[in-house]
UniProtKB/Swiss-Prot annotation:
Disulfide bonds join C4-C37, C6-C30, C20-C38. It comes from the Eukaryota. Transmembrane segments: none annotated. This is Pi-stichotoxin-Hcr5a. A synonymy between H.magnifica and R.crispa is controversial. Weakly inhibits human homomeric ASIC3 (IC(50)=5.5 uM). GO terms for cellular component: extracellular region; nematocyst.
Length: 41
């Protein structure tokens, strides 16, 4: 996916998702335009 910033961390932008997908170890997320930014810090 596309890199994105969330709370000072670099995360992955997921298009058209309301929540982070399971199985990736994400524990931080930020709402983005038409999607969500997920970080596994």
């Amino acid at each position: 996916g596309t890199p994105c910033k969330c709370h000072g961390y670099i995360g992955v932008y997921w298009f058209m998702l309301a929540g982070c997908p399971n199985g990736y170890g994400y524990n931080l997320s930020c709402p983005y335009f038409l999607g969500i930014c997920c970080v596994d810090r």
